[in-house]
Amino acid sequence: LIFSITQIIPPTASALVQARSKISSRVFQYILNELNKAFPPDNLYKGYHLIAVDGSEMQIPLDFSDPDTLHKSASKGKFLSAFHLNVSYDVLNHRYLDTIVQGIHSKNEVEAMWKIVERFHDDNAIFIADRNYATWNTMAHIIQSGKSFLIRVKDIHSISSLLRKFNLPDEEFDLDLHITLTRKQTKDIKSQPEKYRFLSTTSTFDFIDEHNPEYVLHFRVVRFKLDGSEEYESIITNLSRDEFSKDEIKEIYNTRWGIELSFRDLKFSADLCAVHAKKRESIQQEIWARMILYNISFIMAHHIINKKPKGKGKKKSILMR
């Protein structure tokens, strides 16, 4: 018998780059979504997904022709290019769910958050975020989408806090509040700062117009002392007190740190800090690809841990915390 062996010649770097340019980064987004659907997360908190939202800056290859990603480093005094990643992360299942990539100059974390919330398919989700996401618009968007939120706000004494004009006690509390948002400036509105909050035309709020001049916002505020400290933390949420106690609100917020740890793993363990591409669309492909790799790693680790070992001791994976 005569065997014909055909030599396989690998594609050149140029050919690979040209082939990548034909693929949209949305394909990778689709793959991530399908992966999460194929292996639905099973760790829930009282039936809810706990989803942290946060942002992280990512340095990318310098390109002076792209002003949206170009900025000057304050510490180093030189020009750099950077993306800002707005990410949602399932903290109980170690799973990336979504991301919105923005140029460093067009960064808008608040808008990115409510877009991510509205794109999430399940209503049984609690979105957890830090103080930079605490706006009336964020709260209204999440409520309108039928989801739940738990956001840390600046404390009652801060001049820029959402809570500053309410007559609140300087102690731990768990209270229901409501406020009417408006762009009108009548004497009646000005005389009732606890009932009304005036929004200037420069303040972004998407639910007031000429047909709907007012918007009533209902929410809950939980204030508690930090462990071993005299300082207070304040949390705003639309979660019911009948379903979630004050201590559970505190516990849920503390899970947010999982997303901070995930950024470290994504950038260094999954090597996102060393992208190969220079084109902005190709870099976004790599961002989604690293998230897919991250999720696959934790899905595999989760199944290994849950599998009953035949031997005496339980096997543990170094991938799981």
Predicted regions and their residues:
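Glycine/small-residue-rich loop that forms an oxyanion/phosphate-binding "nest" at active or ligand-binding sites
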Residues: 32, 36-38
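Conserved beta-strand elements of the Class I
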Residues: 49-51
